[in-house]
Regions:
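Extended hydrophobic/aromatic segments used for targeting, binding, or gating
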Residues: 159, 244, 265, 271-274
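Short Lys/Arg-enriched helix C-cap and helix-to-coil transition segments
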Residues: 137-139, 267-281
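Short, amphipathic C-terminal "tail helix"
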Residues: 263-270, 285-312
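A positively charged, amphipathic N-terminal helix/segment that binds anionic biomolecules
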Residues: 1-117, 121-236, 240-247, 252-256, ...
């Protein structure tokens, strides 16, 4: 084995706990290594250039998703107005929650294997309501306790109905089908999102878009962009930590997977969404008018950086 190959393998930093490791023999292969971690899950290491290209494509897709969100929300609003609790209304409840609270959609198999929950598997006893407030308290991915509150006058009574329904299923989300209740499953939610937003989109795209929106707000609330690179990078680091806390991820994962890098580039250039809004620190993303203004400002900043609208 050549010294060059040895150095490439070392640079992959394959975790020592991995077993059944395979390493690509070609330095430019898009998949550089695979292995099984200590929890028995198959893991993958990709070439940096391939990951960068895929990440760029993902965030470009997010811009299209953001442009389609108004029509998605319009359909969700319409389905929430249906009488009773038919399938469309049950799925609309799920998507409204995805849009408001940064949930992972979860899956039945992941809950079974790891004992943690996402939106599709959260149980009735994980949820409390008080007036317009819905409070979720559950064990999320990696065993983290997640406490999330949603204030929504339309959703709260529907959630109370779901909690009080008479059937043996522990999961919160359900709809009336035929003569009884049927669980809302993760594949149902993803199919509904695809129907509303288009081919290739899923429940996860709400978290990705909102991660960028939260980062844009965090950077704008910080005030005028600092004049030195070191100070700007400290502000970026603080904003990433805030987003990670909202998402329930590490800062590294939040930055790599949920924050459009162009947003951080714009900040380094001296621009935020602050100039497009009266005061982003006083708004509430649960307010549709404020949310729409913030999202429009983020889109302008990412798509063409219009400084007359975006400068801090």
């Amino acid at each position: 084995m050549s010294e060059e190959t040895v150095q490439r393998i070392r640079a992959l930093a394959i975790p020592p706990a991995w077993t059944d490791v395979w390493i690509c023999p070609y330095p430019m292969g898009h998949l550089q290594a695979t292995g099984t971690d200590a929890a028995g899950r198959r893991q993958y290491l990709y070439h940096e250039r391939w990951r960068a290209r895929r990440d760029a494509e993902k965030f470009d897709r997010m811009l299209t998703f953001a442009h389609r969100l108004p029509q998605v929300r319009e359909r969700v609003d319409s389905d929430l107005e249906r009488r009773g609790l038919p399938r469309e209304k049950g799925l609309a409840v799920a998507v409204r929650l995805l849009d408001l609270a940064l949930f992972r959609v979860g899956s039945e198999s992941y809950t079974r294997d790891h004992g943690s929950f996402g939106l599709a598997t959260v149980r009735r006893d994980h949820v409390r309501t008080s007036g317009d407030v819905i409070r979720f308290d559950y064990r999320a991915k990696s065993g983290q306790r997640r406490v999330q509150e949603v204030r929504d006058a339309e959703l709260a009574p529907i959630v109370r109905t779901l909690k009080r329904r008479r059937d043996d299923n522990a999961e919160l989300l359900a709809y009336r089908g035929g003569t009884g209740w049927r669980d809302v499953r993760s594949e149902d939610v993803n199919a509904y999102v695809k129907e509303l937003a288009g081919e290739g989109y899923s429940a996860k795209d709400f978290r990705t878009w909102h991660g960028t929106v939260f980062a844009a707000m965090a950077l704008a609330v910080g005030g005028e962009v600092p004049g030195t690179q070191a100070a700007r990078r400290r502000r970026i680091s603080d904003a990433v930590k805030e987003v990670a806390l909202e998402l329930g991820n590490t800062p590294a994962v939040a930055r790599a997977s949920y924050i459009d890098p162009r947003l951080l580039d714009r900040y380094e250039e001296g621009f935020t969404i602050g100039g497009a809004l009266a005061d982003v620190s006083d708004g509430d993303l649960a307010d549709p008018a404020f949310r729409d203004a913030v999202e429009a400002a983020v889109l302008r900043l990412l798509e063409d950086g219009r400084p007359e609208l975006a400068a801090a």
